[in-house]
């Protein structure tokens, strides 16, 4: 690790870095590369992710003497409840729509189904997110992005299914 000094302008909202928002050892850090600006993925805001900020900082590492690393992004799950009837719908993870179905009166089985759906090869390739069964109804399904990208979850329920809070409770996922 290299010692240095710098400044960061931080706001309460999650926004991408602009040129001049950060300075390290007297060197202005530019905005993240354009590859992080995806107009089709407004939900997860990849340009504001830790991954994008690290790329911007590391682009100037020869000038600053500093390299940045990103930590795994972890999104905790939600407490689960069981339902006498199965629920179905979709979870949109980082802009990618994944079909989900839960089981009747079986939180453990529902967690396993959610984990399998999110970890399916096509879903993982599209989202970069891994689902982990916490093994605990109180903790639900944990999501991780090892490369530090943002994790954004949105529910789309089938007609007649429960509201978002009830759907979250039977899937073990947290919307946000």
Each model region followed by its residue ranges:
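Small-polar (Ser/Thr/Gly)-enriched, low-hydrophobicity segments
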Residues: 1-12
